[in-house]
Swiss-Prot record:
Coiled coil: 484-582
Organism encoding this protein: Drosophila littoralis
Protein name: Protein no-on-transient A
Compositional bias of kind Low complexity: 108-126, 145-197, 624-636, 643-660
Keywords, ordered alphabetically: Coiled coil, Repeat, RNA-binding, Sensory transduction, Vision
Cross-referenced InterPro entries: NOPS, Nucleotide-bd_a/b_plait_sf, RBD_domain_sf, RRM_dom
Function statement: Required for normal vision and courtship behavior in Drosophila.
One GO MF term attached to the UniProt entry: RNA binding
Annotated gene: nonA
PANTHER family: RNA RECOGNITION MOTIF-CONTAINING (PTHR23189)
Amino acid sequence: MENSVKMDTSGNSTPLPQRQARANNQPNKNIGKHGPQKQNEGASDGGPAEKRQRFGPNNQNGGGGSVGGGGGGGGGSGGGGGGGGQNQNKNFANKGGFGGGGNRNRNRGGNQNRSNFQNQNQNQKSTTDAPKADGGNLNDKSNEANNANQSNSNSAAQAQAQLQAQAQAHAQAQAQAHAQAQAQAQAQAHAHAQNQAFRARGGGGGGGGGGGGGGGGGGGGRDRNRGSRGGGGGGQNSGGGNNSQRGDDFFIAQRLRSISGPTHELPPIEVAQETKFSGRNRLYVGNLTNDITDEELREMFKPYGEIGEIFSNLEKNFTFLKVDYHINAEKAKRALDGSMRKGRQLRVRFAPNATILRVSNLTPFVSNELLYKSFEIFGPIERASITVDDRGKHLGEGTVEFAKKSSASACLRLCNEKCFFLTASLRPCLVEPMEVNDDNDGLPEKALNKKLQEFNQERSVGPRFADLNSFEHEYGSRWKQLHDLFKSKQDALKRELKMEEEKLDAQMEYARYGQETELSRQELRKRESDNERKKLEWEMREKQAEEMRKREEETMRRHQTEMQSRMVRQEEDMRRRQQENTLFMQAQQLNSLLDQQEGFGGGNNGGGGGGGGGGGGVGGGVGNSNFDNFGGNSNSPFEVFRGNNNSSMAGNNAGPGANNQQQDSFAAFEFGVNNMNQGGNQRGNNGGNNVPWGRRRF
């Protein structure tokens, strides 16, 4: 059975060899990995992946409570995921979560609750039946090699055992479902008690066990319980007394900012009709029997008006109820107080009203309208009035009646914790509960207990006046003196309080003036510092501007100097070029004249030679004279050569004048040195003319 191979009926593939099964077959534990879960195949049948069984056999039929759906059923086939929240109940085949191969049920919200039913435990579904979006059980060769020991024959044998186990576990699953529901209720209550604002990700949770019971509940599977993230835990629990108080304080502060402006003109308060079922119409009914019902109380008070809410404490035999209007409450009190019911005398009184507050330490400029508007920020007000004497003088106190007890409690708390001012004066209003006695009937005779011994002793003597100097007169006078002392001390205390108030008022005004003066000084110092800072900034900007201006001037001056030097150089270059051009033109002219002169000088030399030696000498002299005269010209270009000894007519010295003229004429040229023989005649063939090109006469 271990090495049996399932053959492919299509005949398209040959069976693959199987490895021997190991004794300790390890399940596929890919829990908590980021990659997709590999398919745990029991045996490869050689067919395509679509035709193979998706899930291997479940080798562990033990309870899957630890990994299954949040304590959902054990047994062979594990529980389905519970709805609601993000429970990831990843119950795999080998974890006892889902029977016969354990489909991976990932519950991500109530609309994706894919439960596995009992008929899915036969492992005959194709891979298309399972949700593919989870990336759950994919083909992997390595996982196939590791888990090839689980054959289909073994899975068939175990499937039959699982069906039997499911039938046995189904009854247990029902009991576990009830237990789990109770556990979830306790977990939710605990989560609400802990004000941890975590999102509720728990599943709905049902029973685990046979064929798709509930998982997920109470944070099962991979639902990591973080604070109140239990199964079906309810949202963000941001309630609580502190949060409620903070919310009330926030809205009170908002309403206070809206009226923080001047209160010179306030509209008059419309006198509204009496509020129905107000706190002033609440009656206390005592000495009742413990068998009385609300219907009997309504029938008892029905002739006197409409009855509102009723609060009964039958253990202590008393009841609180509200009548529609105050006049009807008075009628009911007078009629039913002292009446008998089942052998007991009823006691009917007005209940203490916790919505009425006494406001004292008010300035004389606080009116009914200002008092109403100031205390309206705490909640709706039924009545607000200033207490005055018979002449209409302000007594420095008033009464505020709220519509709700919560508003009165908030007002009392905030005014005691902080200083609440109504005007510009720094006298905070003092708020305290006020006990209002609306009982105008007093104490009738029927309300007294005449069975007491003290009653009989006190009533034994009637009204009388004491005689002077008698025992009764002496002690009666002492009682009067005691009350007079109390009254005098009370008056003295009031006068002292008045003086202290005036003193504190003067100190307050002086301190206010000093504070305003100090604030003005601080403002002045601040402005002076700002002015000094602005002055320093202005000076810095001026300095920077001056430095920039100097840099710009220096740059401009440097540019101008460079431009001037450039212009001078350009002018010098231009003048030199002009002189060179002029000299070049003159040199060309002299060259042309020289060519002409050389032509004439050659003819003269020929004639002299024909005349003999003397004539030759004369002719040579004449020739030399012409040439030398040409060379002595101030425009001669041959001055640029060294050794040019110019001689005048027949070898005579030209004299210093000619030499000076030649030097002045060629002063601009520094190409060579003018060596002129100025001393005596030089006669000969050359005629004293040492020209560089060595022209000789024969």
